[in-house]
């Protein structure tokens, strides 16, 4: 039994280290994947739009989309537009952001988290008045699949749109679940009074996350100094620049991993030395 104590101590320490590191790494990966799922790895928008969802447009034509797709690390490119507004029911109201996407939108993330209904192929040339809403918003407003909701948007005047819920998703990432509804790009552009080739921005998915910073700077170097035909300047930012607080918090978890590793190595070393002393004595 005494001979087995050092081995058991080391084995226990290794098991705890592996479990702790796996849990933290898995958690970080899950959070990162959900942030990327809502907004891709890199976004190109209007430099003057800051970080508001009430964005100023940039012109993104087919030639720019093709040029962005030619970067080796870029896997997918998609246009989007956003419009802050409010949902009002008979008993409650809730602020939200309506995000418009088109046929090119990669809906894999939302299909993976879809609870009810469908995620339709939205359009940039017509409005179907369909919307996909989160489970948390549906619960707050007592809405269900197939319901029609009244949405209101403030421009120079108040605009109202009645939209039909065709899908309900749940990512359990409340910061975004409580915010985003998805619909046709065409509808959001109409609400913003924009031209057909004007959008809030472009989302880019990349092949290798480890090359995020390198790819961001490469695209920014080619894009930032080339304004569109209205003089709007492009701004390239990646997911870590758009969400600094969340990624700073995730970075702190790396410190926790090292603390756990050091403690477990210390415990394993102490156990091994103690076991050897017991055997010798």
Residues covered by each model-derived region:
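Short, strongly hydrophobic transmembrane alpha-helices
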Residues: 4-26, 37
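A structural signal for hydrophobic secondary-structure junctions
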Residues: 57-58, 62-197
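Peri-transmembrane interface segments
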Residues: 4, 212-218, 222-270, 279
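Membrane-embedded alpha-helices of multi-pass transport/permease systems
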Residues: 16, 21-24, 28, 269-281
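Hydrophobic C-terminal alpha-helix "anchor/cap" residues
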Residues: 35, 67-72, 219, 223
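Membrane-interface junction motifs in transport/secretion proteins
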Residues: 28-62
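Structural beta->alpha junctions
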Residues: 48-54, 170-172, 204-213, 240-243
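A short beta-strand structural signal in non-transmembrane regions
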Residues: 42, 138, 197-220, 235
């Amino acid at each position: 039994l005494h001979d087995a104590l050092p081995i058991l101590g080391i084995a226990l320490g290794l098991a705890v280290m592996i479990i702790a590191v796996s849990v933290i790494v898995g958690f970080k990966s899950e959070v990162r994947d959900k942030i990327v799922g809502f907004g891709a790895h890199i976004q190109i928008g209007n430099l003057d739009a800051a970080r508001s969802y009430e964005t100023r447009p940039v012109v993104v034509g087919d030639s720019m989309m093709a040029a962005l797709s030619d970067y080796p690390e870029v896997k997918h490119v998609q246009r989007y537009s956003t419009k802050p507004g409010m949902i009002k029911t008979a008993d409650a109201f809730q602020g939200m952001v309506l995000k418009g996407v088109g046929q090119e939108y990669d809906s894999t993330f939302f299909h993976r988290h879809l609870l009810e209904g469908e995620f339709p192929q939205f359009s940039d040339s017509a409005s179907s008045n369909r919307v996909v809403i989160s489970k948390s918003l549906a619960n707050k407003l007592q809405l269900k699949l197939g319901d029609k909701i009244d949405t209101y948007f403030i421009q120079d005047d108040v605009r109202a749109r009645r939209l039909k819920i065709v899908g309900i998703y749940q990512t359990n990432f409340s910061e975004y679940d409580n915010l985003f509804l998805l619909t046709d790009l065409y509808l959001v552009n109409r609400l913003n009074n924009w031209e057909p080739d004007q959008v809030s921005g472009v989302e880019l998915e990349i092949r290798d996350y480890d090359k995020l910073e390198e790819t961001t700077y490469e695209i920014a170097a080619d894009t930032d100094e080339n304004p569109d035909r209205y003089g709007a300047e492009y701004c390239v930012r990646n997911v870590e620049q758009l969400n600094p607080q969340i990624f700073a918090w995730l970075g702190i978890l790396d410190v926790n991993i090292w603390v756990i590793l050091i403690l477990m190595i210390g415990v394993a070393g102490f156990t091994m030395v103690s076991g050897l002393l017991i055997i010798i004595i």
